[in-house]
């Protein structure tokens, strides 16, 4: 499951659990984005903070794990590189790449997007009622095998990372929107405030969007 996870929230966890059940997956690997390349419109917490929040959030589920492949690779994060690295580490596995369905709206702009469907099946998770828009996208999808892309509705995705960040900045509670350990980590590190508690996190900031590309 690829994403910025800034912060990871309960919607991500419910979505991962739902997809794992629907597709009978042995494991869901969460892959926090390293350095994104699209829509440099906002600051993002340091990669190490986002990685540690994801580890905290997923620790209690034996079916979940967290990978550092995008963070440790360095340079801009491209989904094609993520899939290549995961495939190299799991040569016998059938890969499913889980991401937000809204992110798939720009999939034709992703680097080498056609090749990615030979490496994994894609699962877009969305709020109920979401439809993949764009005739050019739908036309391109028709050229792919029927099971190349699936959309899964997850009611818990009404929670968003952007809302969690805004609430934290306004000193409003984020309890029950994100796992308890993540609430405590955000408070300890002073994330999403105008003056982070630790200058290193600020120095590590990069600009990003919600989902991996």
UniProtKB/Swiss-Prot annotation:
It is an enzyme of class 2 (transferase). The keyword Endoplasmic reticulum does not apply. Disulfide bonds: none annotated. Keywords: ATP-binding, NAD, Nucleotide-binding, Nucleotidyltransferase, Pyridine nucleotide biosynthesis, Transferase. Pfam families: CTP_transf_like. One of its GO terms (molecular function) is ATP binding. InterPro entries: Cyt_trans-like, NadD/NMNAT, Rossmann-like_a/b/a_fold. Its EC number is 2.7.7.18. It catalyses: nicotinate beta-D-ribonucleotide + ATP + H(+) = deamido-NAD(+) + diphosphate. Residues 200-213 have a biased composition (Basic and acidic residues). Residues 194-213 are annotated as: Disordered. Pathway: Cofactor biosynthesis; NAD(+) biosynthesis; deamido-NAD(+) from nicotinate D-ribonucleotide: step 1/1. One of its GO terms (biological process) is NAD biosynthetic process. Catalyzes the reversible adenylation of nicotinate mononucleotide (NaMN) to nicotinic acid adenine dinucleotide (NaAD). Belongs to the NadD family. NCBIfam families: cyt_tran_rel, nicotinate (nicotinamide) nucleotide adenylyltransferase, PRK00071.1-3. This is Probable nicotinate-nucleotide adenylyltransferase. The gene is nadD.
């Amino acid at each position: 499951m690829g994403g910025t996870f800034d912060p990871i929230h309960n919607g991500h966890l419910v979505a991962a659990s739902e997809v794992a059940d629907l597709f009978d997956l042995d494991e869901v690997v969460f892959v926090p984005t390293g350095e994104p390349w699209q829509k440099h419109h906002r600051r993002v917490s340091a990669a190490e903070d986002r990685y540690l929040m994801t580890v905290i959030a997923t620790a209690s589920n034996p079916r979940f794990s967290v990978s550092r492949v995008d963070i440790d690779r360095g340079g801009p994060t491209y989904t094609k590189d993520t899939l290549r690295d995961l495939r190299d580490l799991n040569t016998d596995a059938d890969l499913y790449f889980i991401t937000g369905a809204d992110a798939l709206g720009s999939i034709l702009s992703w680097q080498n997007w056609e090749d990615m469907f030979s490496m994994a099946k894609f699962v877009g998770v969305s709020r109920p009622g979401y439809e993949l828009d764009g005739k050019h996208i739908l036309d391109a999808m028709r050229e792919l095998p029927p099971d190349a892309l699936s959309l899964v509705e997850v009611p818990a995705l009404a929670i968003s990372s952007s809302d969690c960040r805004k609430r934290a900045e306004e000193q409003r509670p984020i309890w029950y929107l994100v796992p308890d350990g993540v609430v405590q980590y955000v408070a300890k590190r002073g994330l999403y405030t105008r003056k982070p508690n630790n200058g290193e996190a600020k120095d590590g900031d990069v600009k990003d969007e919600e989902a991996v590309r």
